[in-house]
Amino acid sequence: MASTASYSPSPTSQWRTQKLPKRFNFYVIHNQEFGKLSQSSSLSTSSFPKTLKLPVIHMPINNIQSQTTVCVSTDENLEELVNLQKIPNGFLNKESNKRVFIQDPPWVSSLFMNSLFVRAKQVQGVRREFREIERRRRYAMLRRRQIKAETEAWEQMVEEYRELEREMCEKKLAPNLPYVKKLLLGWFEPLRQAIEKEQNAETTVKHRAAFAPHIDSLPADKMAVIVMHKLMGLLMMGGKEERCVQVVQAAVQIGMAVENEVRIHNFLEKTKKLQKHMTGAQSQEDMSKETMILRKRVKSLIKRNRVVEVRKLMKSEEPESWGRDTQAKLGCRLLELLTETAYVQRPVDQSADTPPDIRPAFRHVFKIATRDPGKNIVKKYGVIECDPLVVAGVDRTVKQMMIPYVPMLVPPKKWRGYDKGGYLFLPSYLMRTHGSRRQQDAVRGVPTKQMQQVYEALDTLGSTKWRVNKRILNVVESIWAGGGNIAGLVDRKDVPIPELSNSDDIMEVKKWKWKVRKSKKINQELHSQRCDTELKLSVARKLKDEEGFYYPHNLDFRGRAYPMHPHLNHLSSDLCRGILEFAEGRPLGKSGLRWLKIHLASLYAGGVEKLCYDARLAFVENHIHDILDSANNPLNGNRWWLNAEDPFQCLAACINLSEALKSSSPHTVISHLPIHQDGSCNGLQHYAALGRDSMEAAAVNLVAGEKPADVYTEIALRVDHIIRGDSIKDPAIDPNALLAKLLIDQVDRKLVKQTVMTSVYGVTYVGAREQIKRRLEEKGLIDDDRLLFTASCYAAKVTLAALGELFQAARGTMTWLGDCAKVIALENQPVRWTTPLGLPVVQPYFKTQRHVIRTSLQILALQREGDAVEVRKQRTAFPPNFVHSLDGSHMMMTAVACRDAGLQFAGVHDSFWTHACDVDQMNRILREKFVELYSLPILEDLLENFQKSYPALTFPPLPKRGDFNLREVLESPYFFN
């Protein structure tokens, strides 16, 4: 239809119409041709948006052809408005006339809508651009903070001490400081002065190299802070010694910390000089990337994409490593200065007229090592002993200590080599080799392409963004402030030391001494656990307000991945796992709501985790009231969640499920909770796949079943059957009869679980005995220690025998692996192999060589890796290490595949985590990757590799393989569950 109305896509366009003399109505002219046109898109209601409002257009209708749809007026001046050659008879029939509105042709509406779409796209583009700018700004800010945390930590601590000193002098704030902070503040200035005096002393180069190398490589204040915090940190970490740490350990740790700080300090000082030597004409834009980054010391390390260049500069100018000898010598001298300057004072008794009790905070003493049976050689070792007054307040003020290698605020650097990846500036290594130079050389010598899958897997694990679950942290803080001792938290009070009675009976005195030793040992363990809890909580407190953070990962020598931060991480206890959650939230969805309920039931445990999925769902439905009460009133309600095996994780699941159930649309509720899928005795699963044994495969859920098969319960039933049989025997003939009677009704799943779990990892009889002994101690039914020991010995033998009966094929594979390792080790060679992902592994079991060095504090005996292998250790450790390398490969393969599928993924060896809505997809992936892994000729490749490496040696033939079909794993619902 022709139209003279002007149209512009602009919203401000003006509609101009020809003025008409009088009001008129518009009617459709009926014509035979109109029927065709009425069906065209120009009059179709679907050709124009119904919601779009357009102005009515008044149009001149001169020179309109008869075949065209026309709108005319029925006014008196009709002839003045319209001049048609031929008007149909029905035109002036008012009964057939219909009132309508003008509609534009399709090209007009199309043009209008296109303009709207263009504008919408432009707006979206601008918004995306602004979001990207904001994202970059946010990332740059976080990167600045991360770099500062890695490079200025010790310097900030120095400034804090100086500020506290000033405030103390001006405002007398000392009484308000935490106990340990007071101690450290009191030690800081005397130690700083002693170090400064040592640095300025006119000693010969030879003397300094012998007793205090590199002591002048850092400012005295920074070195003082490092010594104090490192030593206190070692004391808080706990260990075998009570209130003390071995000199060798402390000296080397302090020396390493100083060396790392020296590298950063020297680098920053050098860049300050570069800044001064720059010409005035050189513009800001022409400055080198390195100089821009380093301007105003670490504050200049904020420019995006500049850290790589800085790392290269540091790498190119780094001196060689000091070595353990130098680290130990420097550490010993600094420890000596601390023991000479640090004092502690008992609180003054106002009523007593006595001088203040001031004594050294630390003492250097020697202890006698445990004697070897049958040997008269007495070995002594030096320790730094801490005064009880220092210990008294340590576990309550751990938060004052500096913790290195905290989670990162930005994603870690991608791995590109042995020492290229992880933290931005802190030394980061792909593998924890513990000084094994052979393992380091093996990893460094591998082409980058061969290690690509390993790098990608570690990058995937490191790119998972976490955050602190504040609701769980608040509950933990409330319990901890109240003294702990519930929900698995350690008691904050020591057990009382028994007092000596007035009896002169020698046996009573001996019994009292034994009880005192036991109480002190318990208190020592409680102290260590309290320090560990405080370390975890201190990290959580620092991170609770962060939008998210990341865990750089690296490997142990077998290829298992671990977060580099040691305290608050998802591989740790229920406390840590409950506090942590994914930073990214995703809607639950229908399947996610189901998996959340299953997850909650599994965390509650108590046998519920071994039920089928439907039974677990029914368990949750039957406890909805308890779940809602736990979420709403975790500490003041009926506290149902405290009965769970993993209470804090269970509480987190209760809160998430409560949010969903309260919502009008549960499936759309956003969930941040990681849902776990755990392997069923994963070590035996790998052995069953290697040996293709159908019976073992069914026992560990490689085969579909109506409910999960429980290998631990199966072994417990076998052990109980054997013990009951022995209990009816004559004690005069079989001495185990009395022990069997003692153990009746004490054998359950928990008693044997740890031994069964570790049996495939090479647990020895001694290890099994200690595991079972701990479980029997927990039951508390056997008071006599000697009887407890003999009962544990008997139960361990029976458990290992039951395992051998059920898993004969796995035992055969373990024996073959051990025999191959023995053949190699007898040639004084370590066992080497390459994992399916291309990671080279060298077993680090060598006889150590003692290396004696003289320090200012004492003569130290450092141990280093020798040339002779430990044959027995090489043989016994190879089967579990090999299986660990396989489960590590499976986890890394799954991680990369989940990343490619768009899933968030976290792995804990044999436990894989993702969002609730993605569990089904992750389950499919992890099964596919398991089948893919064991479709490879793993044992055949291993034997071929051994034969190529040692052509002169004869290896035993491969163990026989069963007929289990690996693809059955794809259909097994409880393979991981």
Curated annotation (Swiss-Prot):
Please report the name of this protein according to its UniProt entry. Answer: DNA-directed RNA polymerase 3B, chloroplastic
Query: Per UniProt, what is one Pfam family of this protein?
Result: RNA_pol
Q: Which SUPFAM superfamilies match?
A: DNA/RNA polymerases
Which lineage is the organism of this entry classified under, starting from the top rank?
Eukaryota, Viridiplantae, Streptophyta, Embryophyta, Tracheophyta
Look up the EC number in the record and give it. Answer: 2.7.7.6
Where it sits in the cell: the answer is: Plastid, Chloroplast
Name the source organism.
Nicotiana tabacum (Common tobacco)
Q: Which GO terms describe its molecular function?
A: DNA binding; DNA-directed RNA polymerase activity
Q: Which UniProt keywords apply?
A: Chloroplast, DNA-directed RNA polymerase, Nucleotidyltransferase, Plastid, Transcription, Transferase, Transit peptide
